[in-house]
């Protein structure tokens, strides 16, 4: 008892620590789980409140569409009026009126816009352009500068087409064309050139010329056959006379020559008659062909000339044949009789035989001539 009492007494004597100095009590596992559950409950309550705030009870009100209404002030167009200029109206200038009539309305829209600041309608476009007589403003004014800027935006082809309508020169750079157009439109006046000739009239004139030339050619062609017919008739008469003379010569030659050659001459006669008939037929054909063209006429003249030259030759020359063996023997005999056999060579005798018959080539019969010479000498 004494030992247990001693520590108690000692404990009573030791001072107790203050409350602030006491160590914090650590929560137990049960307390931690309870705190977590409370926090989870709080989170769930907050989520439920959010969901309730999102859910709208009843039908949703539709929003009205606010449409923008453009309150455009209606532009009041100025009434179209053609101001009187200082120059002459374009329709009164003959050449410009001619070019305006040739152009289409679409090609004149840019010119109309330049003159009146509006494209214009199809029905009144050409009329309005023709009524233009010059700009009412002066050179160097703001309106003049606006027109100059408008023209500078146009392409070269468009500026040239405007120059063509206004009867102006189309050569030069764009700046030159712009100045030329504006200077003219300030005070329009005629260029003094004559009206261009229409293509239709020129084509008609060319047709008339062709027709007139055609008639003259036809008349020449009709005259030529008459002349040719006269020439052909004279040719026929000459041919007949020649045929008759050739027949007379043949008869005389028949009387002179022996009767052996009569059959050959008769055959030649038949050939000659057939040739004369053919020549007469060809002359008639030439008459018909000569009336077709001049080229055929020239060719027919040449042919007739060649035929005439061939007809002039006697028929005996045509019918001559190379000498026979007997004739060659006789000629060789004559040559040997007159020649000195000691000096004369075979070559010289052959040459003399050839000279007696110059119209024929006797080189192939050289061997026959040599054999005859040898026979006669022996």
Swiss-Prot record:
Q: Where is the composition biased (Basic residues)?
A: 196-205, 261-280
The record's section on SMART domains has: SAP
Q: Give the matching SUPFAM superfamilies.
A: DEK C-terminal domain
Q: Which residues carry this modification: Phosphoserine?
A: 20, 33, 53, 74, 123-124, 161, 203, 206, 212, 229, 232-234, 245-246, 253, 290-291, 299, 304, 306, 309-310
Enumerate the spans annotated as SAP domain.
149-183
Residue list for modification Phosphothreonine = 14, 16, 292-293
Question: For bias kind Acidic residues, which ranges apply?
Answer: 32-49, 245-256
Post-translational modification remark: Phosphorylated by CK2. Phosphorylation fluctuates during the cell cycle with a moderate peak during G(1) phase, and weakens the binding of DEK to DNA.
Give Gene Ontology CC terms: B-WICH complex; contractile muscle fiber; nucleus
One GO biological process from the UniProt record? regulation of double-strand break repair
Chain ranges of the DEK-C domain: 322-378
Short name of one Pfam family: DEK_C
Where is this chain compositionally biased, Low complexity type?
281-299
Sequence ranges of Basic and acidic residues compositional bias: 20-31, 50-65
* Residues in the DNA-binding region annotation: 340-354, 370-374
Assembly and binders: Found in a mRNA splicing-dependent exon junction complex (EJC) with DEK, RBM8A, RNPS1, SRRM1 and ALYREF/THOC4. Interacts with histones H2A, H2B, H3, H4, acetylated histone H4, non-phosphorylated DAXX and HDAC2. Component of the B-WICH complex, at least composed of SMARCA5/SNF2H, BAZ1B/WSTF, SF3B1, DEK, MYO1C, ERCC6, MYBBP1A and DDX21. Binds DNA.
> What's the stated role of this polypeptide?
Involved in chromatin organization.
Q: Please state what the protein is called.
A: Protein DEK
Q: Which organism is it from?
A: Rattus norvegicus
Source lineage: Eukaryota, Metazoa, Chordata, Craniata, Vertebrata
């Amino acid at each position: 008892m004494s030992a247990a009492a001693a520590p108690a007494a000692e404990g009573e004597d030791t001072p107790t620590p203050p409350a602030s100095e006491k160590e914090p009590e650590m929560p137990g596992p049960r307390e931690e789980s309870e705190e977590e559950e409370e926090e989870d409950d709080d989170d769930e309550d907050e989520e439920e409140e959010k969901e309730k705030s999102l859910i709208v009870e009843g039908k949703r009100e539709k929003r009205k569409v606010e449409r923008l209404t453009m309150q455009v002030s209606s532009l009041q167009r100025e009434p179209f009026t053609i101001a009187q200029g200082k120059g002459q109206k374009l329709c009164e200038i003959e050449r410009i009126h001619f070019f305006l009539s040739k152009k289409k309305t679409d090609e004149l829209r840019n010119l109309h816009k330049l003159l009146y600041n509006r494209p214009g309608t199809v029905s009144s476009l050409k009329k309005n352009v023709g009524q233009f007589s010059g700009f009412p403003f002066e050179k160097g004014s703001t309106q003049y500068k606006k027109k100059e800027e408008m023209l500078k935006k146009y392409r070269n082809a468009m500026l040239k087409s405007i120059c063509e309508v206004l009867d102006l020169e189309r050569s030069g750079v764009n700046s030159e064309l712009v100045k030329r157009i504006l200077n003219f439109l300030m005070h329009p006046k005629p260029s003094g050139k004559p009206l261009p000739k229409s293509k239709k009239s020129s084509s008609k004139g060319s047709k008339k010329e062709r027709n007139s030339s055609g008639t003259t050619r036809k008349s020449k062609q009709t005259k030529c056959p008459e002349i040719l017919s006269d020439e052909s008739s004279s040719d026929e008469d000459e041919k007949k006379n020649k045929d008759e003379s050739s027949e007379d010569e043949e008869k005389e030659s028949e009387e002179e020559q022996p009767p052996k050659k009569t059959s050959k001459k008769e055959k030649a006669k038949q050939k000659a008659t057939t040739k004369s008939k053919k020549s007469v037929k060809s002359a008639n054909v030439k008459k018909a062909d000569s009336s077709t063209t001049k080229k055929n006429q020239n060719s027919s003249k040449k042919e007739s000339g060649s035929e005439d030259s061939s007809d002039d030759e006697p028929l005996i020359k045509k019918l001559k044949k190379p000498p026979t063996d007997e004739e060659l023997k006789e000629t060789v005999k004559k040559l040997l009789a007159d020649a000195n056999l000691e000096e004369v060579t075979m070559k010289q005798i052959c040459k003399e035989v050839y000279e007696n018959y110059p119209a024929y080539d006797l080189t192939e019969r050289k061997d026959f001539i040599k054999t005859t010479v040898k026979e006669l000498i022996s």
